[in-house]
Regions:
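Class II aminoacyl-tRNA synthetase catalytic cores and aaRS-like
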Residues: 1-172
Length: 172
């Protein structure tokens, strides 16, 4: 086992035993380890550490590898749990989930700068909010909600503001 390295493919042989402390009540007691393949070169990031001590640029350049790190994956699990709780609560209260367009010909509400783009050689913008569509759909379904990306083309003086984020919107 001491010769094992990250990204190796192995076959484990052993016996399955009941163990109440194990996550699913069982554990494999290994009697043999066979290395099936080794990586051609070491991974560019040490994914076995709790925290990736590297730059954002390196994390993005090696994103498929960085996401194998437990802390990097945890960010997605937290987002998923928040969105699921929001959805579950609103479903329980009789809301209908809608999915609004994210590309439009113009902005639906004022006040926010828009990301402009060319869409099949015509000017378009990314959605800054689902508000216009929610107000239209509430007349149909009475209670509506959406979880989805929104885009704001605004410069910020801090690193804590995002130009794209997941919006949790409801209307009744």
């Amino acid at each position: 086992i001491h010769d094992l390295k990250e990204a190796m493919c192995v076959r484990l042989t052993g016996t399955l035993h009941e163990e109440e402390r194990a996550p699913h009540g069982r554990e494999l007691r290994i009697s043999h380890v066979e290395i099936l393949s080794s990586p051609a070169e070491p991974l560019p990031l040490a994914i076995d550490k709790w925290k990736l001590n590297t730059s954002l640029e390196a994390k993005l350049n090696y994103r498929p590898i960085a996401l194998r790190n437990v802390q990097e994956r945890a960010k997605f699990k937290i987002q998923e749990a928040l969105v699921r709780a929001f959805r579950d609560y609103l479903y329980e209260k009789g809301f209908t989930e809608i999915h609004t367009p994210k590309i439009g010909a113009r902005g639906a509400e004022g006040g926010a700068n828009l990301f402009k783009l060319s869409y099949f050689h015509k000017p378009a913008v990314l959605a800054q909010s689902p508000q216009f569509y929610k107000q239209m759909m509430v007349g149909v379904f009475d209670r509506v909600f959406e979880t989805g990306p929104v885009f704001r083309a605004e410069k910020h003086n801090t690193k804590r503001h995002l130009n794209e984020y997941t919006s949790l919107d409801f209307e009744m």
